[in-house]
């Protein structure tokens, strides 16, 4: 799925040797399927691995990718390019800006779930978080639930209002209000 050159794999192995035990690599994409899509690579501590992640095995380490964004990383190449100035990792993802959601969803809930997975969760996943739609009632109230780094985060009020609610209300006229059903417990998993 993601082709990592031998030089880049050796570079990752070297970098990981200086990190806490069981730290791996995360490849992520922000704003997938849009002209503003951006890919990135980061360290992935063991406590930031999510149930929604796909694990890819390489020589001496694993790469984790959120399953909802894996199609955007099809045929991606990570390489270590060296020139006179030094070396730099490059990530080329030819499908990052493709819109795979062109199929017509059969329900508002499906459309909202797709929207959350494509527009909101890639941003939240950078902090180890995620949001899921629980239901939309007949009055247009969307019940959502946060998990991972978002659960118990002191910034959740801002994330709910400024990121999730604002984008859902502007994208779906049928939604009148967004309600957070998460039982927030602050802990080591919380981002802030």
Curated annotation (Swiss-Prot):
Necessary cofactors: [4Fe-4S] cluster
Protein's UniProt name: Fe/S biogenesis protein NfuA
Organism the protein comes from: Buchnera aphidicola subsp. Acyrthosiphon pisum (strain APS)
Gene name tied to this protein: nfuA
Record-listed [4Fe-4S] cluster binding positions: 150, 153
Protein family: Belongs to the NfuA family.
GO biological process: iron-sulfur cluster assembly; protein maturation
Record bears the keyword Metal-binding: yes
Cofactor note: Binds 1 [4Fe-4S] cluster per subunit. The cluster is presumably bound at the interface of two monomers.
GO molecular function, one term: iron ion binding
Oligomeric and partner information: Homodimer.
Keyword Secreted assigned: no
Biological function: Involved in iron-sulfur cluster biogenesis. Binds a 4Fe-4S cluster, can transfer this cluster to apoproteins, and thereby intervenes in the maturation of Fe/S proteins. Could also act as a scaffold/chaperone for damaged Fe/S proteins.
Keyword set, alphabetical order: 4Fe-4S, Iron, Iron-sulfur, Metal-binding
């Amino acid at each position: 799925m993601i082709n990592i050159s031998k030089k880049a794999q050796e570079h990752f192995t070297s970098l990981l040797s200086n990190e806490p035990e069981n730290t791996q690599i995360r490849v992520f994409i922000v704003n997938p399927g849009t002209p503003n899509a951006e890919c990135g690579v980061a360290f992935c501590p063991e406590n930031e691995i999510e149930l929604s992640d796909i694990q890819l095995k390489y020589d001496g380490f694993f790469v984790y990718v959120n399953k909802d964004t894996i199609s955007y990383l099809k045929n991606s190449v990570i390489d270590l390019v060296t020139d006179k100035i030094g070396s730099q990792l490059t990530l080329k993802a030819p499908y990052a800006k493709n819109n795979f959601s062109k199929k017509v969803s059969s329900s508002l809930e499906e459309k909202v779930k797709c929207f959350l997975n494509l527009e909101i969760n890639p941003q939240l996943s950078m902090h180890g978080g995620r949001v899921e739609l629980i239901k939309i009632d007949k009055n247009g109230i969307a019940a959502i639930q946060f998990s991972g780094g978002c659960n118990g985060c002191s910034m959740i009020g801002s994330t709910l209002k400024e990121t999730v609610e604002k984008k859902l209300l502007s994208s779906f006229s049928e939604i009148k209000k967004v309600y957070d059903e998460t039982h927030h417990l602050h802990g080591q998993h919380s981002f802030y």
